[in-house]
Amino acid sequence: MKKSGGQIWREGQRKMKEQAKAKVVEKEWGREIWMANNAEENYCSKILQINQGYNTSLHFHLEKHETFYITKGQLQVDSICTINGVKMSRILNEGDTLELKRGVPHQLTAYDGDVEFIEISTFHKDSDSKRISR
């Protein structure tokens, strides 16, 4: 066993990646709190907050695969089926989850008040977000 920075690690055990503080990104629609974005492990974790009356752009990702978990409020998710072009809309409530696969155009809207949700996804690259409309 080795001691490192007050922690004891067994031989061969990988150390946890330390992150001093979450990164906060202010958006015109609310904000994102980035807990992790790790290219090596292909992993990203954020808390998103969308203010009442606001929405994200209609966009898609070629590489990013996302899962949402609603922690507060209601989230309206508008998406477009990439096979037949049919537009779909659904309302997610606290405790609901939704998985969005790569390539699916989607827009997220605070429905009837502010909304907060956790996004777990593959690694986030700004260049992978393709905006269709604001």
Question: Where on the chain are the PLM-derived regions?
Answer:
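Short acidic-glycine-tyrosine-enriched beta hairpin
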Residues: 81-103
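A short, N-terminal "cap"/entry segment at the start of jelly-roll beta-barrel domains
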Residues: 1-46, 55-57, 89-93, 132-134
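Glycine- and acidic-residue-biased ligand/ion/polar-headgroup-sensing regions
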Residues: 63-82
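Double-stranded beta-helix
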Residues: 2, 25-28, 107-134
